[in-house]
UniProtKB/Swiss-Prot annotation:
One of its GO terms (cellular component) is host cell nucleus. Residues 1-205 are annotated as: Transactivation domain. Plays a role in the initiation of viral DNA replication. A dimer of E2 interacts with a dimer of E1 in order to improve specificity of E1 DNA binding activity. Once the complex recognizes and binds DNA at specific sites, the E2 dimer is removed from DNA. E2 also regulates viral transcription through binding to the E2RE response element (5'-ACCNNNNNNGGT-3') present in multiple copies in the regulatory regions of the viral genome. Activates or represses transcription depending on E2RE's position with regards to proximal promoter elements including the TATA-box. Keywords: Activator, DNA replication, DNA-binding, Early protein, Host nucleus, Isopeptide bond, Phosphoprotein, Repressor, Transcription, Transcription regulation, Ubl conjugation. The keyword Ubl conjugation applies. Transmembrane segments: none annotated. This is Regulatory protein E2. InterPro entries: E2/EBNA1_C_sf (IPR035975), Nucleotide-bd_a/b_plait_sf (IPR012677), Papillomavirus_E2_C (IPR000427), PPV_E2_N (IPR001866), Reg_prot_E2 (IPR033668), Regulatory_protein_E2_N (IPR036050), Regulatory_protein_E2_N_1 (IPR042503), Regulatory_protein_E2_N_2 (IPR042504). Belongs to the papillomaviridae E2 protein family. It comes from Human papillomavirus type 18. One of its GO terms (biological process) is regulation of DNA replication.
């Protein structure tokens, strides 16, 4: 009859042989990575059992302390379960390597997300190139939603920090103000991504889409739509007294906002012809717009593709959505125009996917 040490030694040899097979095979399917973390879990369970029996070595290996084996086993369970959930998503057919699913990358910011395609972001503090810190923006970030499903997005880089959009909300995992407090003295910093310097009003999103440059600039609208009408007219805030921040890289100019009164729903929809009564509700120019409504990921790709048609519109927003139950999965892009003629030309020239709904209206700028 075998002793506990002999039994555990045999089991450990079997498990570790299979772990070595995973290293040698370097498989790229997600099921192999799930099996790998299950083996790591078993390996540490064997070490834990050995400690319980007072065994100090197995197969000439020193048996780790209780807390070490327990901690490693818990981490293996965490990664195994995360990968099992990811395997139920649309991303299971992508390549998944040991490097993509390693513990070090899982614990790297943003934590508890799978990440691929890292790109360097350099931040210079105090205007001093010798006082520089390097951060990572990811082409792909795979995160678990509140509903327990998995979604995919990309890291965006702004003057404020590094973030990804999780269920319609910007989730920052690095904030440069906090970093500046640690590494700077003057409270100023410059953000360099690719060949660009990002100022207060710009952001850049990393992407793995072959049709899109990984360092394309995403210009944000400075006016946020106000939810008075979901189909035609949207009131916006009017800003004034804004201080230039171009020469102060660490401080964005702050502006007071004067809000227009809500649009009276009895006025009806504004049309390209006739009198627009909304002009009387607040000061500013009424600008022709369209809302493009559809799947958020599809809109993100569409927004980038529309850049080659920039002569056919004035501005384009980032993807946004109305708050409330059931609205998080549907995104909206707002496109503004210099004139109704330009808008008409845009609609007649630019191909919009059938899955995207087009809503025509006006915005007071």
């Amino acid at each position: 009859m075998q002793t506990p040490k002999e039994t555990l030694s045999e089991r450990l040899s079997c498990v570790q042989d299979k772990i070595i097979d995973h290293y040698e095979n370097d498989s790229k399917d997600i099921d192999s990575q799930i099996q790998y973390w299950q083996l790591i879990r078993w390996e540490n369970a064997i070490f834990f059992a050995a400690r319980e029996h007072g065994i100090q070595t197995l197969n000439h290996q020193v048996v780790p302390a209780y807390n070490i084996s327990k901690s490693k086993a818990h981490k293996a369970i965490e990664l195994q379960m995360a990968l099992q959930g990811l395997a139920q998503s649309a991303y299971k057919t992508e390549d998944w390597t040991l490097q993509d699913t390693c513990e070090e990358l899982w614990n790297t910011e943003p934590t508890h997300c799978f990440k691929k395609g890292g790109q360097t972001v350099q931040v210079y503090f105090d205007g001093n190139k010798d006082n520089c810190m390097t951060y990572v923006a990811w082409d792909s970030v795979y995160y678990m939603t509140d509903a327990g499903t998995w979604d995919k997005t990309a890291t965006c880089v702004s003057h404020r920090g590094l973030y990804y959009v999780k269920e319609g909300y910007n989730t920052f995992y690095i904030e440069f103000k906090s970093e500046c407090e640690k590494y700077g003295n003057t409270g100023t910093w410059e953000v360099h991504f690719g060949n660009n310097v990002i100022d207060c009003n710009d952001s850049m999103c990393s992407t793995s889409d072959d049709t899109v440059s990984a360092t394309q600039l995403v210009k944000q609208l400075q006016h946020t739509p106000s939810p008075y009408s979901s189909t035609v007219s949207v009131g916006t805030a009017k800003t004034y007294g804004q201080t230039s921040a171009a020469t102060r890289p660490g401080h964005c100019g702050l502006a007071e906002k004067q809000h227009c009164g809500p649009v009276n729903p009895l006025l009806g929809a504004a049309t390209p012809t006739g009198n627009n009564k909304r002009r009387k509700l607040c000061s500013g120019n009424t600008t022709p717009i369209i809302h493009l409504k559809g799947d958020r990921n599809s809109l993100k790709c569409l927004r980038y593709r529309l850049r080659k048609h920039s002569d056919h519109y004035r501005d384009i927003s980032s993807t946004w959505h109305w708050t409330g139950a059931g609205n998080e999965k549907t995104g909206i892009l707002t496109v503004t125009y210099h004139s109704e003629t330009q808008r008409t030309k845009f609609l007649n020239t630019v191909a919009i996917p059938d899955s995207v709904q087009i809503l025509v209206g006006y915005m007071t700028m």
